[in-house]
Amino acid sequence: MATSLRELCKDRILNEMVRTITPEASNGWKALIVDQDSLRVISACCGMFDIMEEKVTVVEKIDNPRQRLPNLEAIYFLTPTAQSIDLLINDFKKKSSPHYLAIHLFLTSKLPEVEFKKLSASLAVHRIKTFKEINLEFLAIESQAFHLDQNNTLFQLFSPDSIDPTEEQAKIATRLVSLCVSLNECPIIRFSRSHPVSAMIAGFTQEKLDNVMRTVKSFKPNDDRSTLLILDRTQDPLAPLIHEFSYQAMVYDLFDIENDKFSFDTVTNAGATLKKDVLLGETDYMWSGLRHQHIADVSTNLTTRLDEFLKTNQVSQYGQHTGSLKEAGEVVRSLPQYQEMMGKYSVHINLADRASAKFPELEQLAYLEQDLATGEDANGNSPKNVTGRLSNYLSDFSAEKYNKIRLLMMYIISQDGIKEEDRRRLMEMAGISQSEQNAFTNLRYLGVTLMKGAKGKKPISPPKNRKSESGNVPYEVSRYVPVVKDIAENIINETLPSTDFPFVKEEPIARATNAPVSKVSLKGKSKQPRWADPNVQVEETKYSGSKLIIFVIGGMTFSEMRSIYELSSHYKKNIYIGSTNILLPKKYIDQLLTLKNE
């Protein structure tokens, strides 16, 4: 089992910050004051219960009106911005009426000199009992996935209209260093030559990491050095477009899920309809076990596990159902005495049922997408009648506009450009407006060749580690393998060419690792999913050996995240994937629209 990034960050927040402050005057009780960004850092890895359990009476945002608590000491966990420091100073501008008894100031990163001078000259400085920069500038969204909460990097780093990309590059590097410090790693850094931005950020990261090694004497990184590989969205511009039918990717693509919150209507036993909000995250063991499964497997596993639960808990008198998710949901509502467990089944039965209902209208589109993305059909042959199938879909008035845009973009990418007259004809057929066509022309800033025969730099592709996936996967609509997976596997097998993926510093001498590469099958041995029963304690050995960190500039997809989990499990290796942000298909197209207006 990989070392959990979320647990690591949670431990740091609790052990390096919250638990270190135990005011005697209030018997250990204190307040916690946060800003928007630091709150997101906490929320990614901690629940409010975890915080409140440590004698925190209240958690409040610094920019909100707050009641004065002059007899209580306060932990301020802030990002070191001018706004947050000004608000802190404002809490103590009147010597006779401070907001809190004392300040314990923890910053997500280094305090700029200008803000340090401002704070030093204020009345607040006399209340500071603790001052610490804890280097926590990323969101640990999953056990093996993180992002930097920078949602506009496609424009800032790839648009010709971006005013100062260097500032954004330096910010990314700083946040990557905070990740490395949290993992206790001083990694070997490599980057892709696919786009200059990867080299720039790799260089900045190396400089900042070297500075930490020189100046922070307490930082003692692991001897078995990890590898940090910096890639960018030009490596695989197709991955954010394709329909992915694993549970997590599908529900985020098809439904309006904001901040991991899924809202739906549920029917009570009394027949009333209630709106329910559910967080999709690793605190839900069912979600963790189901998220990377194909939606068809999710539906089957949910109904099978529900039947087993009913039998195990001797509630068979409620009757058997035929295996449909709708009937399973009715059974769930009839068991009020098992509310907690049934609540989890209810959420996922509802969500999986909605996702499954969408599949029939996407099925034929998915076959065409897979043929375009892989360059072959399900039998491993050259796909037939691609142009005809494409035209049929684009001219279908019932098809969604965004799906047409996604498909046509995939066609252009997969064909390495098309003729100008063909592009105009297909755009007109799909009903794509002049302004929407900007998204297509802006693909060139991600290295995509738009016109057949035009000269351009092709994205660097890694050596393939597997034969064609066609005929070797359970579902024909899931044949495409993200480029990130091939790259990561080449690093693990030490076959990634340094000409295309060079080292920032000299290539290290080959070293022995204490974690041999596993050659076991990718197919799991256990027939019972681990999420089936949270009370069953499963003995799992933590993976040892050097870590691998993959970072994608410009956004990562859920399919890429899933791929990293698969490799980590297969090779029994700590592998993490991160990015500037999560990239959903609609967001990707919307951001392409803004790269340049023509």
Curated annotation (Swiss-Prot):
Belongs to the STXBP/unc-18/SEC1 family. Disruption phenotype: Defects in locomotion. One of its GO terms (molecular function) is syntaxin binding. GO terms for cellular component: plasma membrane; secretory granule. Signal peptide: none annotated. SUPFAM superfamilies: Sec1/munc18-like (SM) proteins. The keyword Transport applies. The keyword Phosphoprotein does not apply. Involved in the vesicle trafficking. Binds syntaxins. This is Protein transport protein sec1. Keywords: Protein transport, Transport. GO terms for biological process: cell motility; cellular response to osmotic stress; contractile vacuole discharge; hypotonic response; intracellular protein transport; plasma membrane organization; vesicle docking involved in exocytosis; vesicle-mediated transport.
